[in-house]
């Protein structure tokens, strides 16, 4: 039984299913009378951590969005470092095409959103909402396709999603920070330096890294930079190998995997996908903000990723991914329009949970992501390789 449960949890599509289920439950709770009140009380549940003057008294929604998501970003930092040193980001030739494609996948959606919302300065704060790919959902769709899509394109999507996350981190740090408190920023920098020194010394104990990472998060939280950036910074400071020869980074990445995929991200989806559609009119979805989000995710991502990839390949700067063709490349570009987690996260930073747009900004994220996933799946299935009978899905 334990082995079968582990096999299910290790399956690439399971995390995406959990995320989708959490989003569906959030929608149900938000739109059913008595459940709506339970849902709101749940998110507003006060949680106090600390003692006396040194405590944080915040609602559950804050702890999910700013603390648990910092752990998610910490896992991204670990993944980026591992891939940079030992994985697909190590070789320039392997990373150049998906990196360049990721840039296109950020520029096109942002431009589409900005053009549609150019006359509204407040709406323009959401320009980055449709720029990121949700790696859990994208990989889940790829898993359902199995051998219809060559392995090289699956690696392309994984690398692109990683680079997308890196772009999102830079965007959050540069464009979604408030007025800076240089005292706390200085303290955060000291913590970061201490983490770097401990990494250089390859200290084998995890506790010092955990303590310094928590302090870094607290100081960044009060500095004006979004607290999740502390998670990424701390992740980069975990040593690949310690003085005892074990890989602390891989151990942490492994131990956090299930927690992030099956607790952090579903909780985040449940806390943020709850769009109250009672009294919502269909016409609201055709407002500039939701239209910019949906078109950015569905059209912007696929056009940006495919156009930038096509240019590099046609100019013979890079080659086509092994055993792939342009039709298959276009299909996976559509799949990359699944924004969901990061899009909801940036939406919160942009509009602070405001209902100014009748929550259609969040609904547009869900619709744009669903359309991208469904259309991308069927296009990929139509243009993909025909799997031979008797060969199992390589993800199983």
Swiss-Prot record:
* Residue stretches spanning the membrane: 15-35, 60-80, 96-116, 126-146, 155-175, 179-199, 207-227, 255-275, 290-312, 329-349, 363-383
Pfam families xrefs:
Na_H_antiport_1
According to UniProt, the reaction catalysed is: Na(+)(in) + 2 H(+)(out) = Na(+)(out) + 2 H(+)(in)
Broad class of where this protein is predominantly found = membrane
Gene3D superfamilies in the record, alphabetically?
Answer: Na+/H+ antiporter like domain
Cellular component (GO) terms are:
plasma membrane
Q: GO MF terms on file?
A: sodium:proton antiporter activity
Listed A to Z, the keywords are:
Antiport, Cell inner membrane, Cell membrane, Ion transport, Membrane, Sodium, Sodium transport, Transmembrane, Transmembrane helix, Transport
Q: How does it sit in the membrane?
A: Multi-pass membrane protein
Q: Does the keyword Ion transport apply?
A: yes
What are the cysteine partners in each disulfide bond? none
What compartments host this protein? Cell inner membrane
Q: Which GO terms describe its biological process?
A: regulation of pH
Role noted for this protein = Na(+)/H(+) antiporter that extrudes sodium in exchange for external protons.
Q: Which NCBIfam families match?
A: NhaA, PRK09560.1, PRK09561.1
UniProt similarity note: Belongs to the NhaA Na(+)/H(+) (TC 2.A.33) antiporter family.
What is the official name of this protein in its record? Na(+)/H(+) antiporter NhaA 1
């Amino acid at each position: 039984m334990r082995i079968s449960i582990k096999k299910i949890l290790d399956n690439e599509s399971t995390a995406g299913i959990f995320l989708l289920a959490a989003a569906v439950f959030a929608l149900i709770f938000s739109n059913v009378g008595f459940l709506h009140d339970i849902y709101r009380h749940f998110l507003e549940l006060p949680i106090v951590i600390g003692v006396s003057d040194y405590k944080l008294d915040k609602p559950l929604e804050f702890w999910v969005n700013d603390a648990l998501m910092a752990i998610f970003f910490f896992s991204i930092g670990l993944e980026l470092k591992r891939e940079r040193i030992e994985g697909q980001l190590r070789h320039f030739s392997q990373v150049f095409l998906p990196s360049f494609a990721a840039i296109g996948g950020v520029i096109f959606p942002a431009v589409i959103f900005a053009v549609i919302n150019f006359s509204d300065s407040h709406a323009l704060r959401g320009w980055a909402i449709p720029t990121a790919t949700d790696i859990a959902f994208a990989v889940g769709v790829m898993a359902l396709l199995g051998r219809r899509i060559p392995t090289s394109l699956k690696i392309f999507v994984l690398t692109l999603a990683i680079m997308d996350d890196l772009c999102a981190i830079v965007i959050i740090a540069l464009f979604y920070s408030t007025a800076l408190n240089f005292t706390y920023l200085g303290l955060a920098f000291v913590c970061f330096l201490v983490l770097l020194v401990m990494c250089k010394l390859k200290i084998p104990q995890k506790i010092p890294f955990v303590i310094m990472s928590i302090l870094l998060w607290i100081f960044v939280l009060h500095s004006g930079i979004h607290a999740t950036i502390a998670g990424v910074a701390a992740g980069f400071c975990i040593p690949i190998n310690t003085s005892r020869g074990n890989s602390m980074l891989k151990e942490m990445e492994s131990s956090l995997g299930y927690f992030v995929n099956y607790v952090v991200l579903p909780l985040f989806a449940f806390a943020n996908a709850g769009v109250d559609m009672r009294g919502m009119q269909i016409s609201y979805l055709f407002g500039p903000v939701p239209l910019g989000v949906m078109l950015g995710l569905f059209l912007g991502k696929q056009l940006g990723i495919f156009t930038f990839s096509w240019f590099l390949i046609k100019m013979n700067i890079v080659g086509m991914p092994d055993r792939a063709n342009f039709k298959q490349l276009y299909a996976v570009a559509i799949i990359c329009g699944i924004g969901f987690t990061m899009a909801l996260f940036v939406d919160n930073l942009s509009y602070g949970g405001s209902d100014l747009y009748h929550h259609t900004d969040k609904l547009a994220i869900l619709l744009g992501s669903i359309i991208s996933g469904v259309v991308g799946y069927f296009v990929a299935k139509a243009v993909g390789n025909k799997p031979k009978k008797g060969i199992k899905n390589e993800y199983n």
